[in-house]
Amino acid sequence: MELTKQQLKELLPKNPYIDNWHSALSILLPDYDINTPKRVAAFVAQCAHESGGFMVLKENLNYKAASLRKLFGKYFPTDELAQQYASKPNKQEAIANRIYASRMGNGDEASGDGYKYCGRGLIQLTGKSNYIAFADSLEITPEEASEYLATFEGAAQSACWFWETNNLNQWADKGDIVTLTKRINGGTIGLEDRIKHYEHALHVLGH
């Protein structure tokens, strides 16, 4: 199936970049076998939730101390530590370097990898290992991938790559939004909104 510009406009009514997104998706979706109404609906729904309607292409870590304690208590076990990070002038960088240190292929907190490889793209690609794998698939460097992820094409292609790499079409074919969400999010955060996007997308795509 072909996702038309009018359909995308209905799916993302507040997005001013429909032409850009449509140009990217019309090429990429068929390339990654996201080519049936259920697959396209599931893909667009998940991306719309993850990116605030295809508007946010970089992870926002602008958290207050209370949120750091609530969301990342493992890394901020005390109020004092959370406050220390929340009040830093470069707090998003500092927070990323702490919460993503020594995992997903990243170095320790001092390496700066956490922020360098923080979430980017429509389905936020996170961690040095994922950046390297995505870059390798395109035969570019992780640094080039980081820049590419800031473009419409790169943000969309990284999401398609993640979708294919994690075999998400099998869950899209079943309409299993719960499992899809767990594969993307690690949990079920925002499930209600994702389902709402999905049902709307199915309607728009005439399925």
Where are these regions (language model features)?
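Short, mixed-charge amphipathic alpha-helical segments
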Residues: 27-35, 144-150, 172
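Non-transmembrane alpha-helical segments in soluble domains
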Residues: 26, 44, 159-160, 181, ...
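Low-complexity, Gly/Ser/Thr/Pro-rich intrinsically disordered linker/tail segments
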Residues: 170, 183-207
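Flexible propeptides and autoinhibitory/regulatory segments associated with cysteine proteases
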Residues: 1-43
